[in-house]
Amino acid sequence: MTTGFLQKIFGSRNQRLVKQYQKTVAAINALEPQIEQLTDDQLRGKTGEFRQRVASGESLDKLLPEAFAVCREASKRVLKMRHFDVQLIGGMVLHYGKIGEMRTGEGKTLVATLPVYLNALSGRGVHVVTVNDYLAQRDAEWMARLYNFLGLSVGINLSQMDHAAKQEAYAADITYGTNNEFGFDYLRDNMVYETDARVQRALNFAVVDEVDSILIDEARTPLIISGQAEDHTELYVRMNALPPLLERQIGEEKADGTGVEKPGDYTLDEKGRQVFLTESGHEKAERLLSEWGLIGEGESLYAPQNITLMHHVYAALRAHTLFFKDQHYVVQNGEVVIVDEFTGRLMSGRRWSDGLHQAVEAKEHVKIQSENQTLASITFQNYFRMYAKLSGMTGTADTEAYEFNEIYGLETVVIPTNRPPKRIDKQDQIYKTAKERYDAVIRDIRDCYERGQPVLVGTTSIENSELLSHLLKQAGLPHEVLNAKQHAREAEIVAEAGRPKRITIATNMAGRGTDIVLGGNAEKQASFLELDETLPEDEKRRRIQKLHDEWQALHDQVKAAGGLHIIGTERHESRRIDNQLRGRAGRQGDPGSSRFYLSLEDPLLRIFAGDRVRAIMERLKMPEGEAIEAGIVSRSIESAQRKVEARNFDIRKQLLEYDDVSNDQRKVIYQQRNELLEANDITETIGAMRQSVIADIVHQFVPAGSIEEQWDVPELEEVLRNEWQLDLAIQEMINESNSISADEILEAVEAAADEAYEAKVELVGRESFSAFERSIMLQTLDRSWREHLAALDHLRQGIHLRGYAQKNPKQEYKREAFELFAAMLDAVKLEVTRVVMNVQIQSPEQLEQAAEQLEEQGSHLENVEFRHAEFAEAAAAAPVAAEAATAAMIGDAMSHGSSQAAAANMSADNVPKVGRNDPCPCGSGKKYKQCHGKIV
């Protein structure tokens, strides 16, 4: 109450910010008469002047009024569009690193030109991020005219572009591209073996279009670069026969044994999208798998030799019970293609992880692709937080303002509309069944059609859009369907959606990014005519003129009928998605209306609010076909949506806290890689590693500060001779000396190692040997990092169980992840030193050839995929198996004695049972607890 009272006096934070920006708007407007007097060349020359001032130390903030005034004037001359005052405010919001909420049709693309121009003056690059290639190319080509007029270069970063084209795109002052491509380029840049193979510059400033879609909806889907793993095709096919033989249990068993309405073999958690076998389900699955010869008779699924089968059992169950055709995926050209649950678009090239995609392929009887193994990954949360300055714009951000601030440190500012909105949002209507709901939707559509009012109907899945299309055909109502299956015609369908009597069905926000103009989009229709090569030029001009003449009459007709009417056939889990659908109507002060039609069979109502609403309907004795239309019900639904949003936010926050651990380690590894790539000579680095490794070996047998009786000199001599090619008579040194310390022995071994190293360098030359060392170092670091990623994933999968031991799983994860990381770095030092010390060199040419083969092996990975993965599933992506050394001499180096071969094959999964103080089975000579036991 006090807060509301104070807000009335002082205004909200949003109102105060807008008021503050309006003062700067007045300063920009005051400059307009002066800027208008400039010739085109003088206006263009302002860019050079601004750049000099920035180089001299003037801040971009101080330059803002002049730069915005110049950009606005250039837009008037080139694009024939003048920025409104509210668009100037939007530009300031973006420049100051905030998120701007702008209603649909308020000109977000034009707003972005202001901060993009201003920040490009620094010469450090600006990235404009969009959700798909079509929008990136459209906006870049449209706005390039403005930027080029002002003397700035524009690049487009698209998927499938070659390396040279990408480097050129990133070198431009302004780079347009998709969130996926920017993220993948970052990962690829950290897998290269030459500095000139990188494409990105330092991440300076990004303007993210549809920021809610990218930073929130896709925050749970990390970008993953992966290769193909072992083929389990036959196993997926055989497991596909299991789910149909199992029955679902209805109800959860309570502590007193009640609660189960119908016993079964598995239970479903629809909220968490998980499936769990019951006790009887385990027994039945084990019996069936035993009959099929997949496990031994009487064996448990949890026996060590069968534990991987559980992964296949659950993948098959999830594929059959939680993922459905034309809702979560479509089958197209013999492939299973994922449908984005937020946008309804097909996500070609993306695959679910953890074997789920292969299980769905087995279910649909299409060709099963191989499983994937992770080479590199990053979340959008951690990628975009690396920019020095980040901003974004969307039509619906205010509902997620807390998350933007909490996760990204971004403040949300609601930007006023240029004209007051006239859209009427009607009360939801709730029916008992889906059939009653669809009958009401058809009645509303028919009413609009007869009055000449265009209708946009939003559905939550392809399946529902096709069901509604079938019902409209039966009702004799002509319509267009806009879903992932009609992706190619999307722009054309949206351009026509505002014409009189036009009925358009769209899945969620398909067509987002393109305005629905009342009367139809004459400009868009004209552009289609321009592309028609069969028409003569005279005929084109005549038709385009006719289009413009007809448009005004159609526009007035639609306005008189009430503007665009939005019908929602189901509430989404997020209020923001519902608001996006509503936001398609009432653009730039046009009239419009919206209404949602719901049924108690909808997932959101059934899971979260069904019982309460059903009780209200039964109390009111609602007859069939009658709807509830009351504020209390709408509030109940909104409350359910808030619960889901809060739950999803908690999930994203938890995932980020876990991912931050691997992100900190990723930064260290990538920094080390970059230092290796950029260093002219890594002799000092290799020398420090060699000293560290030699010290560890000597201290195993001759501990520091110990007496001679505690030394194991014969074993030390043997290890140095067999594993490190150092033939030292240490026992003779001891016998000849009256008193020799452990430190003196260490110095003698280090001197011998340095001498052997220098002899190899002298044979081939410092430059050649340094190049070889760099290749070995990069290859080992990359391989170890991939294995470490898999180790972290396995750790994360079981870490929640620590809660049962009264331990904090997050703290335990951080502690153990750090220990794994330290062990990995030690393993890298050991491996690199071992190869360098053991390598047999005959000639410089042989060394160069080996280095080239190593680099080629690391940079040309076969069957590489660039994809998203559902985060919970991404954790199960397997590591890349250790690559075999490519050069013969490295093969020789790695085969000196059995211990090297054994060590190369030691991992947490195949270490035999051994006492902590026993010698490690890898043959290193260390105690198990100080060697591979440390990693396990």
Swiss-Prot record:
| Keywords per UniProt | ATP-binding, Cell inner membrane, Cell membrane, Cytoplasm, Membrane, Metal-binding, Nucleotide-binding, Protein transport, Translocase, Translocation, Transport, Zinc
Q: Which domain of life is it from?
A: Bacteria
- Record's InterPro entries? Helicase_ATP-bd, Helicase_C-like, P-loop_NTPase, SEC_C_motif, SecA, SecA_CS, SecA_DEAD, SecA_motor_DEAD
One of the record's GO molecular function terms:
metal ion binding
Q: GO annotations under biological process?
A: intracellular protein transmembrane transport; protein import; protein targeting; protein transport by the Sec complex
Residues the entry annotates as binding Zn(2+): 920, 922, 931-932
Gene Ontology CC: cell envelope Sec protein transport complex; cytosol; plasma membrane
Q: Which cofactor does it need?
A: Zn(2+)
What is the top EC class of this enzyme, as a single word? Answer: translocase
Cleavable signal peptide:
none
EC number, UniProt record: 7.4.2.8
The subcellular location is:
Cell inner membrane; Cytoplasm
Keyword Zinc carried by entry = yes
Its topology with respect to the membrane?
A: Peripheral membrane protein
Specify which residues bind ATP according to the UniProt entry for this protein: 87, 105-109, 515
Question: Do you know which SMART domains this protein is assigned to?
Answer: SecA_DEAD (SM00957), SecA_PP_bind (SM00958)
According to UniProt, the reaction catalysed is: ATP + H2O + cellular proteinSide 1 = ADP + phosphate + cellular proteinSide 2
How the cofactor binds, per note?
May bind 1 zinc ion per subunit.
Recorded hits in PANTHER family, A to Z, give:
CHLOROPLAST PROTEIN-TRANSPORTING ATPASE, SECA INNER MEMBRANE COMPONENT OF SEC PROTEIN SECRETION SYSTEM
Which family, according to the similarity comment?
Belongs to the SecA family.
Assembly mode: Monomer and homodimer. Part of the essential Sec protein translocation apparatus which comprises SecA, SecYEG and auxiliary proteins SecDF-YajC and YidC.
- Give the function comment from the record: Part of the Sec protein translocase complex. Interacts with the SecYEG preprotein conducting channel. Has a central role in coupling the hydrolysis of ATP to the transfer of proteins into and across the cell membrane, serving both as a receptor for the preprotein-SecB complex and as an ATP-driven molecular motor driving the stepwise translocation of polypeptide chains across the membrane.
Name of the protein described by the UniProt record: Protein translocase subunit SecA
Give the source lineage, highest ranks first: Bacteria, Pseudomonadati, Pseudomonadota, Betaproteobacteria, Burkholderiales
Q: Which gene encodes it?
A: secA
